[in-house]
Design a protein with these regions (language model features):
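Extreme N-terminal starter segment of soluble prokaryotic enzymes
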Residues: 2-3
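A conserved beta-strand-loop-helix scaffold within acyl/acetyltransferase catalytic domains
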Residues: 20-62, 70-80, 204, 209-309
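A structural microfeature
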Residues: 68, 168-169, 266, 365
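Alpha-helical subdomain
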Residues: 74-77, 308, 354-357, 364-367, ...
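Acyl-donor binding region in acyl/amide transferases
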Residues: 79-163, 281-359
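Short, solvent-exposed loop/turn segments at secondary-structure junctions
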Residues: 126-128, 178-180, 207, 273-275, ...
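Acyltransferase donor/substrate-recognition loop-hinge adjacent to the catalytic core
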Residues: 149-230
């Protein structure tokens, strides 16, 4: 019989975190997250999510053996913004067993009802960089660092058997950085925008120069995704958390901002793919692991774009075209990059998906966020 227990001791926290590493230890596509990041998600004193919202964590046991885990969340600002009563689940991992899946999801449903929620949505995490959904396509491809989730194909069957249906899909696109070209229509629109002079491209030589613009980047980040399915207004501490984590790996020379009247209205955030180093580090982040990450930054031939934003006020001035032109310029800067990915674009971002196809991108991974009414 499967037993579900709350994670309420340090020993159980450790079992919760370690279970994923054991489950995927022989999976070549899996990229282990940094363990301290997962522990931070479980710590109300460290993670800004808990400034406004709540979460609990559960383990599934078969006898004394851990066979699954799940986090149950309520994001109060998201619900307030969307006028919803959603509970969410995340950090969902388990063996291929329907009884285990049912027990974990039943516990989340019970937890949600106790708090007045009427629907469960997920996987959906603690912040915008956590990655959305259960992967339903592209399992043969390596996970893009920890900017998306990776799971075995059977997860889809288990949640759908439970009664979950699709809420929204997030696609990730493959692109050959050295072959991608700016379409004539895009180039013309970008040229007109630059000639008008109202939109200016800002470049950076190093992180010291970039840091001077971080306050403006924070503001632009919060305003660029208001039309996205997953959007809710981030608090200052959440924005600081997201931006500071993103800038650890970002390449200053390739990062571009669009500025209008000294205000950042668009940006492209490129990240060198250090997945191979993460795999070797196995969740650790000591001096040796940091050296390994720094070395991988200099030699990886993969680049990831997981932060392309444009404020609505700039879209009518050719901002969209300018964003794609500078994205392509960024990947052309360094011939070392032979592979690229644009990570997790929601299907509700219809125009952006069309733009990516026009640029020659190929959708090659799909993550599905599920929903189920529980009222």
């Amino acid at each position: 019989m499967i037993k579900i227990i709350p994670v309420n001791t340090k020993q159980l926290q450790r079992q919760f975190v370690e279970f994923q590493y054991e489950l995927y230890k022989d999976c070549p596509q899996f990229v282990p997250p940094i363990k301290s990041d997962i522990y931070a998600m479980m710590n109300p004193k460290k993670h800004p999510f808990y400034d406004h919202s709540v979460a609990d964590f559960f383990l599934a046991l078969d006898g004394d053996k851990v066979v699954g885990r799940i986090a149950a969340l309520i994001n109060k600002p998201f619900n307030a913004y969307h006028q919803s009563t959603d509970a969410e689940f995340y950090l969902f991992d388990l063996i291929d067993n329907q009884e285990v899946a049912n027990a974990l999801l039943d516990r989340v449903a019970e937890w949600a009802r106790e708090r007045g929620m009427t629907k469960i949505v997920g996987p959906k995490g603690f912040g915008p960089l956590d990655g959305y959904g259960i992967q339903i396509e592209g399992h043969e491809h390596r996970q893009m660092m920890n900017m998306m989730n990776y799971n075995y194909p059977y997860y889809q069957t288990l949640v759908e058997n439970y009664g979950f249906t699709k809420a929204v899909d997030f696609v990730s696109s493959y692109v050959d950085p050295q072959k991608i070209e700016v379409p004539e229509k895009v180039a013309k629109a970008a040229s007109i925008a630059k000639k008008r002079g109202s939109l200016v491209i800002k470049t950076f030589k190093n992180k010291a120069e970039l840091k001077q613009w971080i306050p403006q980047l924070r503001s632009a980040y919060n305003g660029s995704f208001v039309q996205n399915w997953e959007y809710y207004p981030l608090t200052k501490r959440e924005i600081d958390f997201v931006v500071s984590n993103a800038l650890i790996l970002v390449i200053p020379e390739m990062l571009k901002m669009i500025v209008k009247d000294d205000k950042v209205v668009g940006f492209v955030l490129p990240f060198p793919d250090v997945s191979r180093a993460f795999q070797k580090n196995k969740g650790k982040l000591g001096p040796i692991e940091i050296i390994r990450l720094l070395a991988e930054i200099k030699k990886t031939n993969w680049i990831d774009f997981n932060g392309i934003g444009i404020l609505p006020e700039a879209q009518g001035f050719g901002g969209n075209a300018l964003i794609y032109e500078i994205l392509i310029d960024s990947v052309h800067q360094n011939s070392r990059y032979q592979h690229g990915e644009l990570t997790q674009v929601a299907e509700t971002a219809v125009q952006m998906r069309k733009d990516l196809l026009n640029l020659g991108c190929v959708f090659y991974k799909n993550h599905r966020v599920y929903q189920k009414t529980i009222a």
